[in-house]
Amino acid sequence: MDTAGIRLTPKEIVSKLNEYIVGQNDAKRKVAIALRNRYRRSLLDEESKQEISPKNILMIGPTGVGKTEIARRMAKVVGAPFIKVEATKFTELGYVGRDVESMVRDLVDVSVRLVKAQKKSLVQDEATAKANEKLVKLLVPSMKKKASQTNNPLESLFGGAIPNFGQNNEDEEEPPTEEIKTKRSEIKRQLEEGKLEKEKVRIKVEQDPGALGMLGTNQNQQMQEMMNQLMPKKKVEREVAVETARKILADSYADELIDQESANQEALELAEQMGIIFIDEIDKVATNNHNSGQDVSRQGVQRDILPILEGSVIQTKYGTVNTEHMLFIGAGAFHVSKPSDLIPELQGRFPIRVELDSLSVEDFVRILTEPKLSLIKQYEALLQTEEVTVNFTDEAITRLAEIAYQVNQDTDNIGARRLHTILEKMLEDLSFEAPSMPNAVVDITPQYVDDKLKSISTNKDLSAFIL
């Protein structure tokens, strides 16, 4: 697995995070150092490696200030498997719900997909060539071979012919005639020139087995995996366009070309050494003394999470995985509870703590304009597909930021997420009418913003409905 990103210096990591996330420099520095320490550890001898564990991080800050985005972007920068889980989804072992080990199994699933996607990319040309060969045969088929008659020893018992399931001539063809060879040569040329992309072709694809709905979540998943391994793969015939068929066939051939067992082992190692698990809403399982009944359950979840953070061997469908060197990032607003309300053992497993700042009007302005694909650029690009040009003035952007900030102050503070719904509300009419406005140019001014959002910015009851 290519993990060249792990060799980035902390400054380079922060620089890459700055392309997508505004502010929160302290949090960016801490995650950058954590990533660099992983690279430093990889350079040590085996004995030293085993002694050094990642320093888990606890992010403290209100919703919508960038906690999840920092962790997700960090994982993308280094090509590490990453999952986000919510602590409130877990229950104590023995109760209905997800057990804490499921987050490790989910991480391994992500790791397997990452490794296999990279390995498939290395054989993509060969797989596509095989897919094109198959498409030529499907578009110009030969005569099918007749099913061979084989003696079945059970025939005499049942008084008739018994189909021999060991012989499968379904896909066997007679040798192509000269006429078919000529036609295939012409079809191959047209395929290479892209002239047949929209033509329909019938292919056989593996059918997804139905889910078992009568069991609990984890039981369901484990039983489903067991049944999938025992049951033969069922194929169904579908009629699709050539371009779609090529993707399906190439993906199937790529699966055959890579060493599945080697990929699984590489994925397990990647999850162990580079995996990042983001545990959101960890403050919701912190205990206080106001409700002893709930506190018992919350403490149970914390104590179940603790062994995973300390290092446990978890069984997955790909093999065992050790969590000792995975990086865990806990996050929560901690409005009601405090980090000290977590059980002491769990507090000790998050030695690095960082408080994220609430967002100001200036931060909102930067969020709207600075990131690589900022919200303003996204909406401009979307409307440009309808040949509608939208120009936001600087004053209009500032006015949008002021309204978003004010609504956050007057109602629930949901941080930068407020900008999404404010923008969506403001551009609702334009988005609806855009298909009938070709070549239109629309200037978004402070007056335009006020006209569209006046009722929201002045009516607290109404602004409560703008999430």
From Swiss-Prot:
Entry-linked HAMAP family: HslU (MF_00249)
Compartments, record wording: Cytoplasm
UniProt family annotation: Belongs to the ClpX chaperone family. HslU subfamily.
Source organism (scientific name): Staphylococcus aureus (strain Mu50 / ATCC 700699)
Tagged with keyword Chaperone: yes
Matching PANTHER family: ATP-DEPENDENT CLP PROTEASE ATP-BINDING SUBUNIT CLPX-LIKE, MITOCHONDRIAL-RELATED, ATP-DEPENDENT PROTEASE ATPASE SUBUNIT HSLU
Chief subcellular location: cytoplasm
SUPFAM superfamilies per record: P-loop containing nucleoside triphosphate hydrolases (SSF52540)
CDD domains associated with the record: RecA-like_HslU
Molecular-function GO terms, alphabetical: ATP binding; ATP hydrolysis activity; peptidase activity; proteasome-activating activity
Name listed for the protein in its UniProt record: ATP-dependent protease ATPase subunit HslU
List of residues binding ATP: 22, 64-69, 280, 345, 417
Annotated region described as Disordered, given as residue ranges: 149-192
Top-level division of the source organism's lineage: Bacteria
InterPro entries: AAA+_ATPase, ATP-dep_Clp_protease_ClpX, ATPase_AAA_core, Clp_ATPase_C, HslU, P-loop_NTPase
GO process annotations (BP): protein unfolding; proteolysis involved in protein catabolic process
Keywords noted in UniProt: ATP-binding, Chaperone, Cytoplasm, Nucleotide-binding
NCBIfam families, per the entry: hslU, PRK05201.1
Subunit structure as annotated in this protein's UniProt entry: A double ring-shaped homohexamer of HslV is capped on each side by a ring-shaped HslU homohexamer. The assembly of the HslU/HslV complex is dependent on binding of ATP.
Biased composition (Basic and acidic residues): 178-192
Annotated GO CC locations: HslUV protease complex
Function according to Swiss-Prot or TrEMBL: ATPase subunit of a proteasome-like degradation complex; this subunit has chaperone activity. The binding of ATP and its subsequent hydrolysis by HslU are essential for unfolding of protein substrates subsequently hydrolyzed by HslV. HslU recognizes the N-terminal part of its protein substrates and unfolds these before they are guided to HslV for hydrolysis.
